From Swiss-Prot:
Comment block on domains: The RxLR-dEER motif acts to carry the protein into the host cell cytoplasm through binding to cell surface phosphatidylinositol-3-phosphate.
Superkingdom of the source species: Eukaryota
Leader sequence segment: 1-20
Keywords, ordered alphabetically: Host cell membrane, Host membrane, Membrane, Secreted, Signal, Virulence
Protein name as it appears in the record: RxLR effector protein SFI5
Primary gene name: SFI5
């Protein structure tokens, strides 16, 4: 009896071992598949993130070289007494902005990338920066109070422009650069220096001359990569002539 039962026990044991091995292999295969799936997802995420960074970098590069508005345009709007809210209506985005504020719609990030909103934001930042200027602060304060179209604003504008003109004409006046348009002012100074250098000795302006002009224009040694990029670009343009 025992002899007959022994082969059966061995068969059951072998069957159990084989089943266990198959189950282990299947489990390992599932785990490997899950790991591979997760890894693929992470890699796709990294590729997407990298692509997003590249797109954002390209957008920032275009923004640095192609601002939504020029300083002259924004200065003209400010002197006309135009508020940021009035400009939003002019751009046709006032209603959308109100909807985002009241409803918190999910596609607000897409809206913020539109040319209209970028112009609005650029002008808003310009007004905030001009508010820090002692000369133009009273004008901006009146604009914020929706008094930009009043006679009082026009009278104040005449006084401000007269005061600014006198300061610019004074030889001892300290040049104050608008933080929003600092690089543009520096470029203008550099271009003027290049023209003077050409008139004096007909030689190509040296990099040292350009750097000195930048320091004089900015009242400090340039430390941002944007300023050095401007210098490099002007230098290359100069050498091509």
């Amino acid at each position: 009896m025992l002899r007959q039962a022994r082969p059966l026990v061995v068969l059951i044991a072998v069957t159990f071992l084989v089943a266990s091995e198959v189950f282990s292999m299947a489990l390992a295969s599932d785990q490997n598949s899950n790991v591979a799936s997760i890894t693929s997802q992470v890699q796709r995420l990294l590729r997407t993130h990298h692509a997003t960074i590249k797109v954002n970098a390209d957008s920032e590069e275009r923004f640095l070289t192609e601002p939504p508005l020029t300083t002259d345009e924004m200065m003209a709007m400010m002197k006309a007494g135009k508020s940021k809210n009035a400009y939003a209506f002019e751009l046709g985005i006032a209603g959308q902005m109100a909807d985002f504020i009241n409803s918190g719609l999910p596609d607000i990030e897409t809206f913020k990338k539109t040319p209209e909103f970028q112009k609005y934001e650029f002008y808003m930042n310009f007004l905030n920066d001009m508010r820090k200027d002692d000369d133009y602060k009273p004008l901006v304060e009146m604009i914020k109070k929706n008094k930009g179209e009043t006679e009082a604003f026009k009278t104040l504008l005449v006084k401000v422009e007269d005061s600014v003109s006198k300061k610019k004409a004074s030889p001892s006046a300290i040049v104050k650069l608008d933080p929003l348009n600092r690089e543009q002012a520096i470029v203008e100074k550099i271009e003027l220096a290049l023209k003077k250098n050409q008139a004096l000795n007909k030689n190509k302006a040296s990099l040292e001359t350009i750097e000195h002009t930048v320091r004089m224009a900015a009242k400090s040694k340039p430390s941002t990569w944007k300023i050095f990029k401007i210098i490099s670009r002007l230098k290359k343009l100069k050498l091509k002539r």
